[in-house]
Amino acid sequence: MAISTGSTSTGSTPTGSIPTGSVSNGSMTTHRTPVSATATSGVVAAKAPISPATRLRTALATVCISGALEDKLAAAAAAGFDGVEIFEPDFVASSWAAAQVRQRCADLGLSIDLYQPFRDFDSARPEMLQANLRRADRKFDVMRRLGTDLILVCSSVAPDALDDDDRIAEQLHQLASRAHDRGLRVSYEALAWGRFVNTYERSWEIVRRADHPALGLCIDSFHILSRGSDPAGIEQIPGDKLFFLQLADAPYMNMDVLQWSRHYRLFPGQGTFDLPAFLGHVLAAGYTGPLSLEVFNDVFRQSEPQPAAVDALRSLLALQESTLGRLPLPDSVEAGSGTVDSAAPGSSLAALSGDVGVPEPPTAPPVPALGGFAFAELAVDDASRPAVAGALRAFGFRHCGQHPTKPVQLWQQGGARVPLNFSPDGQQSTGAAVAALGVETEDPVSAAARAQALLAPVLPRRKGPAEADLAAVAAPDGTSVFFCRTGADDATSWLSDFPPTSDATSTDRGTDGGAGIGVSHIDHVALTQPFDRFDEAALFYRSVLGLQTQHSSEIAAPFGLVRNRAVADPSGAVRICLSVSVLRRGSEWQPGVTDPQHIAFATADVVAATRAAAEAGAPVLRVPDNYYDDLDARLAPLAQLLEAMRELGVLYDRNADGEFLHLYTEVLGGRVFFELVQRIGDYSGYGESNSPIRMAAHRRQRTGAGQHAG
């Protein structure tokens, strides 16, 4: 917990710096070796098997992140990338000469793996072809000064584009010959919106007909998967003709593919494309060049570049881990002086390195099996403390533990534990806030090691001599995530830091402690994310904790669109709901709740629990009669149940899998509230359709309007 272990949550977003000893795709961040300008990385024998001599490097297109070119290069290097793609508009806008860019990359340990893009080359007009060849010669001059040997040529979208494979092949042959004479190569890519060439199958046929050693393919996951093409055919392409690989994820969207590509690409693992399968096909073809990210995203290009670059590298590490299990590798291979177990998650393709001077990286332990929430810690100040503690008491929680040296109380009912942290160091902001989450796992040390290997910032801690030894990392929004093995009778359990209070009973410290109102455990925690950290948070929880996306939704809230994404472990023991406002225009017309957070407690009978809580003075959120009239029309719950829900303010949802009853409290301390939930059958949702009702009710509470609506 933030104060009981000495780590603090100040509300500032983690910088994204790599923990000491973390790795970058097969090389320690202090041992990157630049690739020479004449290197031919990416060209291997056809169908070359994955072997100890194979080393897959990582690269980041400068277009992925914000800032000037110098900012982007620094961020890529700090994150641990091996190389970059120089996006031509970034270079043209830079005050640095090509030689300066080359030297800066060398100083940072970055190779320049690609110069891109060269657009609209082929032409039906002879004079335009000559102009394009002249333009290419000038770009080749730039490439030589930059120290890169590979240029990306996109299929044409121009009105004079050719629809003749033989003529396009002939023109590309001319281009490749000019490049070859200067020690350079050309990588041809089919844009998904190309005028005529818009599939990888056709681009490969053109390259095959051109038949020039300096001409190969660039394979881009977005251009292929956005069109619904089958990537399995990539395996039939000779590996020595796969010059470059660009990776991007994306959500499935029914829109113009150009707009989809330019605004909504994501890092691997953040969207819905099956990139592990895609990468597996590319590697099966014999590709061993860089794994490069080319992601156009409006949010990423507004965000701080260094955290975005760290998120990008984390996505590649997780992708390699996911892909590895699908490849027909032997049980173990020798890598340098060590052995890499191909069955171990994290013994990624990057670890299959025989490069001299490149150490074998430590492998990431497997995804931890989670046993639920150990706790959800709230930071409170003097103003919010009475309201939060009062609501917990009305919900049947007991103050059953007190840290002996730090201002942290432990409140518990059943297996639901809520530490209240009164320390100024633990406060993310004024009022109340979720400061930390504890997740149960049998091997906290392994779970923490995995988090660090996946570039999660390890939090500093201040541990007393008799305190439990806990490890924590920072989520993208600054929330601390602890790995716990609670074990009530275990002296190393974090519970040992909280001697019982006089309010505790003999059963309070177990998972069935305290009768209360019937709360059994924490069902889920909901966290609003900063605008530029929503996708990063989903990737963090997916890669570090193994939480998979259950579903995503968009809600028409009273003050704008809210995007939700629910993630959970396979058993449903740990569920986290992430949300973000799609657009934010300030607070002058948003007198509701800023960045709300809430903790949901599970119960077997929400009506009985709510009645008991209300009688104890719980600040139950009032729901208007209009909701229940509409509910009766839509879902027609039993009349007795409907009347009880109307009386108590309980909300309801139902689908083919089951039913969901839930109740909210008023907002406590500015942004935090509680929820009681009852799941019936196999219902796995969160009652999202009721969210606008809750948001409007919270606004009424905050403004004092509609006090008599009932």
Where do the PLM segments sit?
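Glyoxalase I/VOC metalloenzyme domain signal
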Residues: 25, 35, 39-44, 54, ...
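N-terminal pre-domain/capping segments
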Residues: 2-5, 10, 25, 31-148, ...
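Acidic/histidine-rich catalytic cores of soluble enzymes
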Residues: 83-84, 174-272
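Alpha-helix-loop-beta-strand connector modules within alpha/beta enzyme cores
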Residues: 101-118, 169-181, 206-212, 273-278
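Hydrophobic faces of well-ordered beta-strands that scaffold small-molecule active sites
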Residues: 56-62, 84-86, 112-117, 151-153, ...
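Acidic-and-aromatic substrate-binding clefts and catalytic sites of carbohydrate-active enzymes
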Residues: 63-70, 87-98, 120-130, 158-163, ...
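Active-site acidic/histidine proton-transfer and metal-coordination neighborhood
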Residues: 32, 46-52, 122-216, 307, ...
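Conserved, mostly hydrophobic/aromatic
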Residues: 76, 84, 105, 143, ...
